[in-house]
Amino acid sequence: MEISGRRMRRFRMRFRRDHLTGGENIENEASCCYCDLKISNFNEPIFRLGRRFSGVLKVWFSIGLGFGVASLILVTVFLLLQFHSNPLFSNRLTSAVFGFSPSTRVSLSGIAYVLVSTVITVSVHELGHALAAASEGIQMEYIAVFIAAIFPGGLVAFDNDVLQSLPSFNALRIYCAGIWHNAVFCALCVFALFLLPVMLSPFYKHGESLTVVDVPSVSPLFGYLSPGDVIVSLDGIQVHKPSEWLELAAILDKENSKTSNGSLYLGGSRRFHHGKGYCVPISLIEEGYKGKMVENQFVCPGDLTAFRTMPCSNAAIREVSVCLDAKDIVKLQKCGDGWVTTSDTDNQSDCVCPQGDLCLQAMQSPGVLWTEITYKRTSSQDCSRLGLDFNTSNCLGTFVFVGDLIAMSHSVHLTAYQPRWLFNFFGKSFPNILERSLTCTFHVSLALVLLNSLPVYYLDGESILESSLQSFTWLSPRKKKKALQVCLVGGSLLSFLAFFRIFLLGLPLSRRW
């Protein structure tokens, strides 16, 4: 498409229109499918900045040129990998790049993070184009933000005649500048995430315990945990980071689904075994409700939980089935080999209880896991000052979760940052907001790199590919044009099929964002 006029660079689309005359005012456009806001206040400052540091910027954007061409090749390979025969592979690849799975449910707050991140990353992208053009002596005509149908975007407008007069190498520096700036911005986000614990260390502890940021009303933990609570352990295993929380939940769920009596190595000297029991006094058992057998299942009334004798080797088992209050039982001494141990002890001693007690375990159905969650209330100043000295604190609590552990672990929002007691009454969510903002900005910026590297029409990839083909001097103009058309048609078709597969057909659910 060759029309005299200026070229507009944008991360979504590119148009060329008639050249502006010197006294013509820039007017905003609005229609049923497109509207924009044009801004020309930054023309002179950006142009002066680009001309002042022209030499340095040309070196900087020459590096970006190499990155842009390499990105075009790598993104094409990524595009082809989307048609990998293994759906799980494609799903993980998409999640790694975009930060979410196609079937992921995005919350309202997540949408807000995406919108803010989009504004920031598009600004960085267009600033790259504007500075690169200024270093070549080309002043932009205006900056614009727009919405085309439902897709937001941004652009900078240049005089197309001046762009066409540039050597292909110089033009490539301008075309690759946007994705180069987005790539550098991704690196800055990663660096900021890495330094975040150090920067926030005067005000927040990091990696000691998990702090609850939010418990949605649909979460099974709603009513048990509150924002600001500190999760100490899951089934007796101390957790320090959200990733450890999810990993441990997956390990416990996997172990529960196994039918053998083997043990699972958790790292270090910790091992997980089968059979979680409690030493229950015989007097409490005799006072308990006996329950009823309904369709070969032991049923208890109300909120009572069914318990039975733990099967132990070399032990004189007294068969007992009784209904007890789980809130009272979890406070008792533990027995059985289903708890975390520091060594491989003799299984014969796992069921040993004090005289007058029996080792009982809760009856569980397949797919339902009995899990203890230990937490600390931090709503009072006294609890906050006690820190991790849980043994002397009456702020420590334990409750039992019975159900789908994987769904439960994803239903609550956690952070590894714990406010120091002076900041416990405000700013609890601040580290989480920073962390999510940086993470979301990283993924959006990376997505812009990939989108604008695609060999498709109306994106930066088209201009990069077109200028790159100009370097092949042995090809005639006709062959260059033909090669460009073949690459763009093929790239556009592959991109459409890939995104249709990713976002419309969907793939297996990965996680909640």
From Swiss-Prot:
Name the Enzyme Commission number(s) assigned to this protein. 3.4.24.-
Q: Name one GO biological process term.
A: cellular hyperosmotic salinity response
* Organ and tissue specificity: Expressed in the vasculature of roots, cotyledons and leaves.
Pull the Lumenal topological domain ranges from the record.
82-107, 159-182, 459-485
The record lists Zn(2+) as bound by H125, H129
What topology does the record note for this protein and the membrane? Multi-pass membrane protein
| List of catalytic residues | E126
Molecular functions (GO terms): metal ion binding; metalloendopeptidase activity
List, alphabetically, the GO terms of the cellular component aspect. Golgi membrane
Ordered alphabetically, the record's keywords are: Golgi apparatus, Hydrolase, Membrane, Metal-binding, Metalloprotease, Protease, Transmembrane, Transmembrane helix, Zinc
Would the keyword Zinc turn up in this protein's UniProt record? yes
InterPro entries per record = MBTPS2 (IPR001193), Peptidase_M50 (IPR008915)
Superkingdom as given in the UniProt entry: Eukaryota
Is Transmembrane helix set as a keyword in this record?
A: yes
What happens when the protein's gene is inactivated? Short root and increased root branching. Mutant plants have increased sensitivity to salt-induced osmotic stress and tunicamycin.
Q: Which family does it belong to?
A: Belongs to the peptidase M50A family.
> What is the protein name stated in its UniProt record?
Membrane-bound transcription factor site-2 protease homolog
